């Protein structure tokens, strides 16, 4: 399967997720779980630490985002990641059947 075909399939799934309302439900669940686990606070602290470093005084948002994003993604608790992935898999299994 070509990359173009994979991109088309991904776009169709995303469109269906949005139109069915499942995207909003999964997104809300993810945000709630991240909030409950203190992820937003931890990422905020990480960004603040980066901004306070002397060599980052003129840091742009885009550069700060690029610096913090990999660490922020790795800080998502495994149980949250697994729970959301399970919801997505269940949704896909329903759609494919």
Curated annotation (Swiss-Prot):
Biological process, per Gene Ontology: chromatin organization; mRNA export from nucleus; protein transport; transcription elongation by RNA polymerase II
Family note: Belongs to the ENY2 family.
One GO MF term attached to the UniProt entry: transcription coactivator activity
Any one annotated GO CC term: transcription export complex 2
Domain of life: Eukaryota
Designated name of the protein: Transcription and mRNA export factor SUS1
Function field: Involved in mRNA export coupled transcription activation by association with both the TREX-2 and the SAGA complexes. At the promoters, SAGA is required for recruitment of the basal transcription machinery. It influences RNA polymerase II transcriptional activity through different activities such as TBP interaction and promoter selectivity, interaction with transcription activators, and chromatin modification through histone acetylation and deubiquitination.
Keywords: Activator, Chromatin regulator, Cytoplasm, mRNA transport, Nucleus, Protein transport, Transcription, Transcription regulation, Translocation, Transport
Pfam families found in the cross-reference section: EnY2 (PF10163)
Record's subcellular location: Nucleus, Nucleoplasm; Cytoplasm, P-body
Gene name per UniProt: SUS1
Signal sequence range: none
InterPro entries, per the entry: TF_ENY2, TF_EnY2_sf
Chief site of localization: nucleus
The protein's assembly and partners: Component of the nuclear pore complex (NPC)-associated TREX-2 complex (transcription and export complex 2), composed of at least SUS1, SAC3, THP1, SEM1, and CDC31. TREX-2 contains 2 SUS1 chains. The TREX-2 complex interacts with the nucleoporin NUP1. Component of the 1.8 MDa SAGA transcription coactivator-HAT complex. SAGA is built of 5 distinct domains with specialized functions. Within the SAGA complex, SUS1, SGF11, SGF73 and UBP8 form an additional subcomplex of SAGA called the DUB module (deubiquitination module). Interacts directly with THP1, SAC3, SGF11, and with the RNA polymerase II.
